[in-house]
Curated annotation (Swiss-Prot):
Homodimer. Its EC number is 1.1.1.42. It comes from Candida tropicalis. Substrate binds at T103, S120, P121, N122, G123, T124, I125, R126, R135, R158. The lineage of its organism: Eukaryota, Fungi, Dikarya, Ascomycota, Saccharomycotina. It is found in: Mitochondrion. This is Isocitrate dehydrogenase [NADP], mitochondrial. Keywords: Glyoxylate bypass, Magnesium, Manganese, Metal-binding, Mitochondrion, NADP, Oxidoreductase, Transit peptide, Tricarboxylic acid cycle. NADP(+) binds at T101, I102, T103, R108, K285, G335, T336, V337, T338, R339, H340, N353. It catalyses: D-threo-isocitrate + NADP(+) = 2-oxoglutarate + CO2 + NADPH. InterPro entries: IsoCit/isopropylmalate_DH_CS (IPR019818), Isocitrate_DH_NADP (IPR004790), IsoPropMal-DH-like_dom (IPR024084). SUPFAM superfamilies: Isocitrate/Isopropylmalate dehydrogenase-like.
Amino acid sequence: MIRASAIQRTAMLLRQLRGFSTSATLADKIKVKNPIVELDGDEMTRIIWQKIKDQLILPYLDVDLKYYDLGIESRDATDDQITIDAANAIKEYGVGVKCATITPDEARVKEFHLKKMWLSPNGTIRNILGGTVFRESIIIPCIPRLIPGWEKPIVIGRHAFGDQYKATDLVINEPGRLELRFTPASGGEAQTQKVYDYTGPGVGLAMYNTDESITGFAHASFKMALAKGLPLYMSTKNTILKKYDGRFKDIFQQIYEQDYAAEFEKQGLWYEHRLIDDMVAQMIKSKGGFVMALKNYDGDVQSDIVAQGFGSLGLMTSALMTPDGKAYEAEAAHGTVTRHYRQHQQGKETSTNSIASIFAWTRGLAQRGKLDETPDVVDFASKLEQATIDTVEVDRIMTKDLALAMGKTDRSAYVTTTEFLDAVADRLKK
């Protein structure tokens, strides 16, 4: 009997060391009805991503992960076809979770001996799926906010299409006229407008957007606001860009009145267009609790401001959602944490915040559960999020960035990358 008991204890210990809980048998795992597309990434986040999967996901879920390695070497070896395949897989299965990836610059091309300077994987995926990028901060009450008044979530919807990010720009080296010309495909008369008469060197730019993309952006934004139970504000500078930004304003208003006004009123919510400068001022003064629909550049900038205002860039989720809700991709809003990865390569201690990467998994799982109508999967995602928050809020176990945000600089105030994930795993078992 004693020997049998010792064997049982040893077996239990081995399971725990492998990252499995005592209830981790296949029969006890929660069944995820349909596949999730997993997009692996680079550097420190790649290491964290694997640990999250091994410690917090696979021990509890019976899930079919369609794996695509979007690490920079894999993208280079496949001429970036792996990114295209991954995006199409998300389109097929409906839900993807993505690790942070490197977007190579000239230095990265040399470092990895790349064939070329590959495009951003996020940009490629967005172009294939369409949709809107929504960024939302993860609120942990004990983490001081740079903007103390923010008590409720602020969700930033970024129209990730066109504008400056697909613009054509040029350097002007001599006097001359810059013109904007549109030639109809129907063969009709071309339209030409003078932009500027240069008397010396300068720069020029032309950018675009489409009614189709703006319409999709509007639908995704209204649906997100309803899903979150929050009012929606659309912000532009239509007083200056009367036709360009005015088109955004008009399309949003038309779609709201046609398709969403009744449901918004039913839920006690509202939609309003505001000038971007006025909206930013109101955002700073507010208590939070709304969705902001912003053009591409504005959304890029404001999402980082909101993240830092809530306490840390490491506490922000990012989700790409199509207007019809049939494709959804979740990821952390931060990068690959190169500086920590260099320390890891040297065998040095790291204290990297994994919370946003954990939430990439949970948000993807929650969406999968909603689509599949499997509340146990949604419930697990919620429990994992709460376990992560409680590790910081209740146990006061946190990584260095969060400790510094609380004004704590002693080494005893924070734990290593691995120790934090271990603590979350322990919390999840309770």
